Curated annotation (Swiss-Prot):
Origin species: Rhodopseudomonas palustris (strain TIE-1)
UniProt keyword terms in alphabetical order: ATP synthesis, Cell inner membrane, Cell membrane, CF(0), Hydrogen ion transport, Ion transport, Membrane, Transmembrane, Transmembrane helix, Transport
Entry superkingdom: Bacteria
Known partners and oligomeric status: F-type ATPases have 2 components, F(1) - the catalytic core - and F(0) - the membrane proton channel. F(1) has five subunits: alpha(3), beta(3), gamma(1), delta(1), epsilon(1). F(0) has three main subunits: a(1), b(2) and c(10-14). The alpha and beta chains form an alternating ring which encloses part of the gamma chain. F(1) is attached to F(0) by a central stalk formed by the gamma and epsilon chains, while a peripheral stalk is formed by the delta and b chains.
Annotated protein name in UniProt: ATP synthase subunit b 1
């Protein structure tokens, strides 16, 4: 009975008795239930994590699709704006060229009119000078009715040729 004098033997006997008491009281069921509850809670958390991961993946895919769509739309807007700007610039250039052409034509018309008026004024002045010179020469050299007649004819002839 030396075996009962060993401390390890009593520890082993106490441990077996403790396990027997725990088995009698149903502690193993409580521990198993606690472990089952913990397993279920962990499983629920994992399921929730998977669900959140799937939602995050869907949101990421949606975000990427929206971003790509927004980039395409922005590029389309930029392209449209460039095309509009080029069209407006071309229209403005055409309008400016038309305006300059009309202004040039108007200026040329005014210059031609002024030249014609100046030429007419010079001709009129020359005609008046010629008439005055002819009148003086004829009045000094010819006297009487013949002078008046020649003077009238000469004046009419000079005016007709110069105008």
């Amino acid at each position: 009975m030396a075996i009962f004098g060993e401390a390890e033997t009593w520890v082993a006997i106490a441990f077996v008795i403790l396990l027997g008491v725990f088995a009698y009281l149903g502690v193993h069921r409580t521990v198993l239930q606690a472990l089952d509850k913990r397993r279920d809670r962990i499983k629920a958390e994992l399921d929730e994590a998977r669900k959140l991961k799937d939602e995050a993946a869907k949101l990421l895919a949606d975000y990427r699709a929206r971003r790509a769509s927004a980039e395409r739309e922005a590029q389309a807007i930029v392209d449209s704006a460039k095309a509009d700007a080029e069209r407006i610039a071309a229209e403005a250039k055409a309008k400016l060229e038309d305006f300059v052409a009309r202004r040039t034509k108007t200026a040329e018309s005014k210059i031609a009119l002024a030249e014609a008026q100046a030429l007419a004024d010079v001709r009129a002045a020359a005609a008046e000078a010629a008439v005055a010179a002819a009148s003086r020469i004829l009045s000094e050299s010819v006297k009487g009715n013949l002078a008046d007649e020649l003077l009238s004819k000469g004046i009419q002839e000079v005016r007709g040729k110069l105008n």
